[in-house]
Design a protein with these regions (language model features):
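C-terminal amphipathic alpha-helical interaction region
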Residues: 440, 456-563
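A glycine-rich, basic-preceded beta-loop-alpha segment at the flavin cofactor/substrate interface
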Residues: 192-194, 229-241, 246, 253-284, ...
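A short core secondary-structure module
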Residues: 182-183, 187-235
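Glycine-rich cofactor-pocket loops
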Residues: 24-27, 56-73, 276-287, 301-337, ...
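Internal maturation/activation junctions in enzymes
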Residues: 62, 126-127, 138-175, 189, ...
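A structural-propensity feature for long, helix-poor, extended segments
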Residues: 128-130, 139-142, 146, 425, ...
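Alpha-helix capping/hinge segments and adjacent helical runs
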Residues: 249, 366, 370-448, 532-560
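Amphipathic, small/basic residue-rich leader segments at the start of a protein or domain
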Residues: 1-121, 145, 547, 553-563
Length: 563
């Protein structure tokens, strides 16, 4: 299937980015011609090299053989094509070995690669984000060795946090780090480690949170780099205990890894592990957004092609008509298209704001970062749920055919279900939005969003619709702010509040598409999706507002039901 449609949409979104003028000032050497060339080359690689691998990765999957993970034939060649093309280096500064391009451009490319194969693309993000983190905080000797190796793809990285009794509750981690004659050593077991072992690169660096002192909670945690092989090439005491047999993402080996006094290197200050790791985690959460949009785009395009080709119904005296002519199929397709285009716009806007948080004039960065922290849970979780919902919707359009492996929709459905689980579940993102972004930050990011979004309002009907939703979000936030002293009351509506924020940000993106997308075929296509979204906007916003402010009364039946 051609990637031209997706490429056209991405390039149009990039041409109408919010805060584009500020981004141009922050990246004066980055021009539209370069952006177009990069996106088009990414599409070629995705379509020609990565896409054909996905069915093989899914069908064969990674295997554990004699204690080592073996990937499927062709996986190594695909990885080599990605890294030799320099695709891990796009957003890093030249002095760090990168190309100095904006993060938003990397986000656009990630969407294309994830559309081709989410399982394949998952390996790239930890290495790139770990390299960026090391470039900022690691000791020179470690930085000078590991950063270029990670960016070249010769070595790869994992992020090791979860344990059997400590997933989202990081403060309960029990893996221990102790000093032995000046050498740090870690002992414990980590689970859910994506690409925890493989045969695609020569060395794997595990970036791990471990308890280095008896200080309570996260204050006792430090960040360590634990290589699977030591500098002399011998194996570290790192053992792959099993790989998980999963619903989807079969080509991405998810490992349980044991560490038995494994040699480790401290990254950053002792006792500041979570704080040191946090920038890497934020970057990985951002990458979840183009991951979800890419998978959703693949499912949507399959459904659209099928609906145009499949013939059923119509006048009994005439030949059957394409099912795309039926009103309910049109509704389904437009509903999926609206969500995909809006999520794409949110992902790119979030990446743009993160770019400005690190590259705008120093005095402006704090404001951009506050806005980024508001947008990030929306982009991450909205796109994660989008991927599964659109895959399910595409299956519905295909009918029984979609339920078979003859079509790739069921693979998208299986692969995407976990997106709203890893890198912070929906509930975790919702609590982050309520407790941190609204209460702790006093709604600073939300307020900045409202100021900037309202600046795009005009006097037309679309602006009136979006403006009313912005007002509704503001009043709902004020209600929840007043419940800060009764968090249990507010927590019952946290997910609804996150969704209301997403609806409002989506309304802003839809309004901008309607204003700026252009009058050619690509612009008309994007505007059709945006107008469908805007038509449902007041209904969706009102429903989420009511759920968000209903309070804990809606949960009163749980004791009786669970008894």
């Amino acid at each position: 299937m051609s990637y031209a449609r997706q490429t056209d949409a991405l390039l149009r979104h990039l041409s109408i980015l919010p805060f584009g003028d500020a981004l141009e000032r922050a990246f004066p050497d980055s021009d539209p011609e370069t952006w177009t060339a990069v996106v088009e080359q990414a599409a070629l690689l995705a379509e020609a090299v990565i896409d054909p691998l996905d069915a093989v990765l899914d069908g064969l999957g990674a295997r554990l053989v004699d204690g080592r993970v073996r990937c499927v034939p062709g996986h190594r060649a695909g990885w080599d094509a990605l890294v030799h093309g320099g695709w891990l280096t796009l957003p890093l500064a030249p002095e760090q070995g990168g190309q100095g391009l904006p993060l938003v451009l990397n986000t656009a490319c990630e969407e294309l690669f994830n559309r081709a194969s989410a399982a394949f693309t998952m390996l790239a993000t930890p290495g790139r984000t770990a390299a960026a983190m090391l470039a900022g905080v690691a000791e020179p000797a470690l930085r000078e060795v590991w950063v270029p190796k990670l960016l070249s793809g010769e070595w790869t990285a994992t992020i090791c946090i979860s344990e059997a009794d400590a997933g989202s509750d990081v403060a309960r981690l029990r893996t221990r780090a102790t000093q032995d004659g000046g050498q740090w050593r870690v002992t414990g077991e980590k689970i859910w480690i994506s690409y925890g072992d493989h045969d695609l690169a020569g060395r794997i660096g595990h970036f791990m949170l471990a308890r280095s002192s008896d200080a309570a909670g996260v204050r006792g945690l430090s960040l360590f780099l634990v290589p699977d092989r030591l500098d002399d090439g011998t194996r570290n005491t790192v053992e792959v205990r099993r790989i998980e047999h999963k619903l989807g993402l079969h080509g991405s080996p998810t490992c349980v890894i044991g560490f038995d006094g494994a040699a480790a290197m401290l990254i950053g200050a002792e006792g500041r592990g979570l704080q040191t790791l946090f920038p890497m985690m934020l970057q990985m959460r951002l990458s979840c957004a183009p991951q979800g949009v890419g998978v959703a785009e693949a499912a949507l395009e399959t459904a659209l092609d099928y609906a145009q080709a499949r013939r059923q119904g119509g006048d009994a005296a005439a030949p059957p008509v394409p099912i795309v002519t039926h009103a309910d199929v049109q509704r389904q397709l437009l509903a999926m298209a609206a969500r995909v285009e809006i999520a794409r716009g949110i992902a790119l806007a979030t990446a743009t704001v993160m770019d400005l948080g690190s590259h705008a004039p120093e005095a402006e960065r704090a404001g951009w970062l506050m806005l980024a922290h508001f947008l990030l849970p929306i982009a991450k979780d909205g796109s994660a749920r989008l991927a599964f919902d659109v895959s399910s919707g595409a299956l519905q359009v295909l009918g029984g055919a979609g339920y078979t492996r003859e079509w790739p929709v069921e693979r998208r459905l299986r692969d995407s279900r976990v997106f709203a689980v890893f890198e912070g579940t929906t509930g975790i993102q919702a609590i982050d939005m309520l407790h941190r972004r609204l209460w702790r930050d006093r709604g600073g990011g939300l307020s900045r969003f409202l100021i900037l979004a309202r600046a795009d309002l005009g006097t037309d009907a679309r602006s009136a619709t979006a403006g009313a939703v912005f007002d509704l979000l503001e009043t709902t936030a004020a209600t929840l702010m007043a419940w800060e002293t009764d968090p249990q009351e507010a927590d019952a509506g946290a997910t609804a509040f996150l969704d209301l924020c997403g609806v409002a940000v989506g309304g802003w993106i839809a309004l901008r598409i309607s204003l700026f997308a252009g009058e050619d075929a690509v612009g008309r296509r994007l505007r059709a999706a945006a107008d469908f979204y805007l038509a449902d906007l007041p209904i969706a916003a009102e429903a989420e507002m009511r759920r968000a402010t209903q309070g804990s009364v809606r949960l009163k039946g749980i004791d009786a039901y669970a008894a």
